[in-house]
């Protein structure tokens, strides 16, 4: 399964309400077959500009990152689901790049005589 990062901006709320929104979001991800690896709180701060969402203007928001693995079909369904959640201001899925690891071919022995500089006679 591909690995994704879900970036969320939640409206400014008290800690219990924020925890409820995150729990709801993580449960929705797991219902759709995702494996949640990590949830990171980046803190609450002022938004770079006023964002209007669900008939409200937001000036502050809580930033969160969810690290997950899931099927490719999860992106469109979760974007639709999160777009309808009134507590989420912005959401974005970022796909992790697939890193290819190169196998080590080992150390090639070098002839010491080839490294010696011939002396001038």
Swiss-Prot record:
Keywords: Mitochondrion, Ribonucleoprotein, Ribosomal protein. Coiled coil: none annotated. It comes from the Eukaryota. The keyword Chaperone does not apply. GO terms for molecular function: small ribosomal subunit rRNA binding; structural constituent of ribosome. One of its GO terms (cellular component) is mitochondrial small ribosomal subunit. GO terms for biological process: translation. It is found in: Mitochondrion. Its main location: mitochondrion. The keyword Zinc-finger does not apply. Component of the mitochondrial ribosome small subunit (28S) which comprises a 12S rRNA and about 30 distinct proteins. Belongs to the bacterial ribosomal protein bS6 family. PANTHER family: MITOCHONDRIAL 28S RIBOSOMAL PROTEIN S6, SMALL RIBOSOMAL SUBUNIT PROTEIN BS6M. NCBIfam families: S6 (TIGR00166). This is Small ribosomal subunit protein bS6m.
């Amino acid at each position: 399964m591909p690995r994704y990062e879900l970036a969320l901006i939640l409206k400014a709320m008290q800690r219990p309400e924020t925890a409820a929104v995150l729990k709801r979001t993580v449960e929705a991800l797991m219902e759709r077959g995702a494996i949640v690896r990590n949830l990171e709180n980046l803190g609450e701060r002022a938004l770079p500009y006023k964002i209007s969402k669900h008939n409200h203007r937001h000036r502050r928001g809580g930033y969160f990152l969810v690290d997950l693995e899931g099927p490719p079909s999860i992106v469109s369904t979760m974007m639709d689901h999160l777009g309808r959640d009134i507590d989420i201001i912005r959401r974005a899925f970022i796909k992790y790049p697939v890193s290819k690891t190169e196998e080590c071919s080992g150390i090639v022995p070098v002839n010491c005589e080839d490294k010696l500089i011939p002396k001038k006679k």
